[in-house]
Amino acid sequence: MSQSYELTAEARERVGKGSARAIRRNGKIPAVIYGDKQPPLSITLPYKEVFLRIHAGGFRTTVATIDLNGEKIQVLPKDYQLDPVRGFAMHVDFLRVGKNTVVTVNVPVHFINDEKAPGIKRGGVLNIVRHEVEFTCPANAIPDFIEVDLTGLDIGDSVHISAVKLPEGIVPTITDRDFTIATVAAPAGLKSEGAEGGEAEAGQAEEGEE
């Protein structure tokens, strides 16, 4: 799990587009904290700190602490809006995290031991079907990533979620099938040779029929 961090917030009394624009002009960003059966809180946060956190990676999988007038609130960033043209952050939604909060998150997939995969050593290409996998898990136990071991994979082999060792309490949201994470595909040259070989065999068969 990524290292938690703290942001200092101020309560926001006014809401709406006009108020939000004024907040952003003052170097801050509007945000809201919701969930855990409590009323939503409208707040403002320092723009620079939030922007850096968003672009540092792992923003939506790291539990943070928001200090609101001395009250420490555990939260998980759930969504944020970026300006479509200039790319700056415009708004953030935070989920309030309680002791027993279970969340749904997208967790990145990391691949290891590609040098131990015969198919890749022979020139095969790792075709990544899912760069992230959606899981439900305790908010205080979100993994930074899951590891997929490629050891022993040959050309044509696939890795399914059932083959991935998951931390305790981490459950895929897709439960009705053993979905594919990645496959090892044949290199282009090998595919061409296979196609040519098939055509030659077909030609020989036709000659034999005559």
From Swiss-Prot:
Q: Per its UniProt record, what CDD domains does this chain match?
A: Ribosomal_L25_TL5_CTC (cd00495)
Question: One Gene Ontology cellular component annotation?
Answer: cytosolic large ribosomal subunit
Name one matching Pfam family. Ribosomal_TL5_C
Question: Transmembrane ranges?
Answer: none
Kindly list the biological process annotations in GO that this record carries. translation
Q: Which GO terms describe its molecular function?
A: 5S rRNA binding; structural constituent of ribosome
The entry's protein name is: Large ribosomal subunit protein bL25
